């Protein structure tokens, strides 16, 4: 009955909105212990809301804050209980634990704060840690909850790793130093990335469009003399064409001016003169014929000067054409001479190469003949050596027989002397 009453109390608290922290592990515990655990395993909604508030809102001026309620009571898997806290690290508030007298910081948080703009991702960080022989510590469930309550990791993350501050310094130096990146430029820090992005945006907005990239201008292939000559020809032809067009335009304008000038004079004279003026002019012409003759002479001289100018302009255009043609002819002669010289040099080099090739073939043939002679001489030497050994052997045998014969003669002579 008592257990049923306890279960009824549980259901009532659950209906009221309470939250279970640690459910009872064994159903065979005593009544007193079960009643105590039942009273301590539930929190009211107000108490849970107070315990789940982030301590970032209650940080003091020094940057450190302690966890409230459940955050402050978070413990490690071990004999000692270590509370999570916020420390000031490189000008930022970072979640950390005091483990065996060492500060262990949250690796995902410091990655987001310091290394996100320097490396490609956390997998790159783990690769660097393996290369540096740094082994981060894996968080347990209580540590993950404490870090989640501090806001160091996202709510859905259930895994995390801790790293020593000294090991993070090594990792940061490895990510920013040039010695670990042979043949590559040095990596930039977080501030450099931000400043660089702002400068690039300003340059893109302020810069004007360029005709072509500098890279293409620097990487142009080297041009041969023939290509340079063709470029000169094209430029000269364009220049002569433009000069011809200018000369034609000048001649046409001059002709139009010559045709239009007397018409304008006659029209203006007709419009400005009245009847009385015409009579007076006729009288003046009658009284002074010399002045009219002189005026006519002046007009004739003006027309002659204009015609001379037109002739001089046409002659200057012809002179320009002649000079341009002379330049083109001189360039063609220079190019032909250069081509002839290069062709002669190529033929000389070809003949020299042919001579060297023939001499090389002769040397190779002589070497083959000498090798054949050497082989024959070696064969003769081996034959003579065999004969020499045979003759020497026969000579030794003959000497041995001779000695035996002499010994026999001496023995026979000694026996005869003894008999006598």
Swiss-Prot record:
Principal location: nucleus
Bias-annotated ranges (Polar residues): 263-273
Region ranges (DACHbox-N): 85-171
Compositional bias annotation for Basic and acidic residues: 242-258
A Pfam family hit: Ski_Sno_DHD
GO terms for cellular component: nucleus; transcription regulator complex
Family: Belongs to the DACH/dachshund family.
Protein name: Dachshund homolog dac-1
Native source species: Caenorhabditis elegans
């Amino acid at each position: 009955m008592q257990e049923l009453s306890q279960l009824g109390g549980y259901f009532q608290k659950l209906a009221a909105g309470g939250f279970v922290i640690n459910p009872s592990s064994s159903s065979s515990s005593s009544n007193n212990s079960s009643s105590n655990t039942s009273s301590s395993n539930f929190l009211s909604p107000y108490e849970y809301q107070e315990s789940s508030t982030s301590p970032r809102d209650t940080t003091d001026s020094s940057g450190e804050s302690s966890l409230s309620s459940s955050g402050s009571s978070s413990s490690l898997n071990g004999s000692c209980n270590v509370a999570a806290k916020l420390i000031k690290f490189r000008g930022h508030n970072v979640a950390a634990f005091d483990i065996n007298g060492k500060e262990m910081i949250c690796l995902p948080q410091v990655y987001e704060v310091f290394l996100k703009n320097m490396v490609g991702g956390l997998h790159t960080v783990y690769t660097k840690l393996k290369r540096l022989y740094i082994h981060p510590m894996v968080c347990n469930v209580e540590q993950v909850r404490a870090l989640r309550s501090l806001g160091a990791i996202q709510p859905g993350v259930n895994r995390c790793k801790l790293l020593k501050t000294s090991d993070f310094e090594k990792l940061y130096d490895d990510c920013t130093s040039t010695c670990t990146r042979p043949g590559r430029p040095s990596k930039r820090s977080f501030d450099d990335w931000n400043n660089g992005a702002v400068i690039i945006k300003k340059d893109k907005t302020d810069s004007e469009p360029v005709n072509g990239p500098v890279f293409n201008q620097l990487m142009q292939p080297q041009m041969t003399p023939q290509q340079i000559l063709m470029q000169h020809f094209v430029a000269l032809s364009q220049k002569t064409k433009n000069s011809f067009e200018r000369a034609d335009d000048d001649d046409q304008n001059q002709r139009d001016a010559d045709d239009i000038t007397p018409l304008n004079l006659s029209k203006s004279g007709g419009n400005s003169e009245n009847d009385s003026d015409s009579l007076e002019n006729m009288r003046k012409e009658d009284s002074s014929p010399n002045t009219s003759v002189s005026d006519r002479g002046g007009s004739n001289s003006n027309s002659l000067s204009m015609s001379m100018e037109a002739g001089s302009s046409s002659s200057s255009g012809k002179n320009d054409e002649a000079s341009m043609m002379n330049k083109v002819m001189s360039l063609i002669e220079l190019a032909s001479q250069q081509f002839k010289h290069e062709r002669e040099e190529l033929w000389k080099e070809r003949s020299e190469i042919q001579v060297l090739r023939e001499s090389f073939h002769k040397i190779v043939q002589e070497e083959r003949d000498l090798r054949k002679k050497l082989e024959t001489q070696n064969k003769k030497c081996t034959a003579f050596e065999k004969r020499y050994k045979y003759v020497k052997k026969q000579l030794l045998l003959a000497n041995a027989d001779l000695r035996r014969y002499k010994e026999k003669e001496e023995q026979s002579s000694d026996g005869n002397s003894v008999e006598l």
